[in-house]
Amino acid sequence: MPSVSFEDSTSPQRQALDWMLGDSYSLEELKNDGDDRIVQRFALAVFYYSTNGPTSWDLENRDGWLLSSTECDWGERSFGPDVECSNNNVVDRISLWSDGLSGTIPREIGLLSSLTFLGLSRNNLEGTIPTEIGVLTSLTGFSFSRNANLSGRVPTELANLSNLEVLNLSNTQLTGSIPSSLCSTLAWAYIDCGEIECDCC
């Protein structure tokens, strides 16, 4: 991960840090849980601020995040949680479909190293897919479809995702190609063939 400046008080990273420093759970309950839990909480908070959680997320989602409790309780809703965890409080799934997300996907997503699924379809995300997606080697599926302003080239680091089975990048402005090394694992891929080359799609 690249170094991050916290001097800009409006940056998602600084906002996440300020929130954690004012959150009793972050300061008290996590102090005996080790660095991994602190990093996970920080990464999710950065994601929230980077995708404009306080201003553009749907109200139910907005009120369900940055709670003074375990991250595994965030985003609990009647039809399914935004965040799912393994038994040891490690986040392994994020599902935020049609929830009003805008802004950009932060590089800190790569800190959530146990993610198996990342679903961010039907939102208003822009910018590029961060190259740090390539360190999420446990991913079996991710969907960023119907984010019309998501642009740039598909990261070549996708080649590292040797467990990837499901990929949806349709209805975006992404270009480039899908690494041929994924052909042996992909069971389902939905992309814009006119913009993204794929030998196995």
Task: Label the model's feature ranges.
Residues 2-104, 195-197:
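LRR flanking "cap" motifs
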Residues 90-124:
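Leucine-rich, hydrophobic repeat-scaffold detector
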Residues 99, 123, 147-148, 172, ...:
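Conserved "Asn-ladder"/turn position within leucine-rich repeats
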Residues 159-201:
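Leucine-rich solenoid repeat scaffolds
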Residues 94-96, 116-120, 139-144, 164-169, ...:
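Conserved hydrophobic beta-strand positions in leucine-rich repeat
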Residues 83-85, 88-90, 108-115, 118, 134-139, 147, 167, ...:
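Leucine-rich repeat
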Residues 102-110, 126-131, 151-156, 175-180:
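The feature encodes a structural signal of leucine-rich repeats
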